[in-house]
Amino acid sequence: MLDIYDPAQPDADSLRQRASEAEAAALSVDGITNSDGGNAGHGVVDVLIATSNGFSAGYQRSSHGVSAVVIAEKDGQMERDYDYSSAVFETDLDAADAVGKNAAKRTLERLGASKAKTGKFPVIYDRRVAASLVSTLAGAINGASVARGTSFLKDQLGKK
């Protein structure tokens, strides 16, 4: 059995409290000037499957999340960034105040950024960017995508 359902069902007040904690923690950091808000959510998906030959089954999947988006301003330059935590189980979420403080840290790190000169440089991707790149690559090398011609590898079929 998959362990993808958390019976914990937070109410609106506890979600509002979690969102407020994330936002307050971010706003408490020097240099953070504004907030686009803290957010907290919970969801449950019920999946039911039935076939014409008599098979039927179902399962539930839950999700919990908390995030904060904040703004910093220095010398007329404004930057915005965020942090979030999501988990199947509420107890696995990062603390709301840690999410808020990390959102503030990420936002402040963007202040004073400048473009690098042209050249060859080693690249380190942020975990959020890396996950997106891996997902895009996985979709491109999927056999069905290649066969449908929707992959950038479509013209490479049969080549080494």
Task: Give names to the regions the model predicted.
Residues 1-160:
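Active-site bordering "gate/hinge" segments
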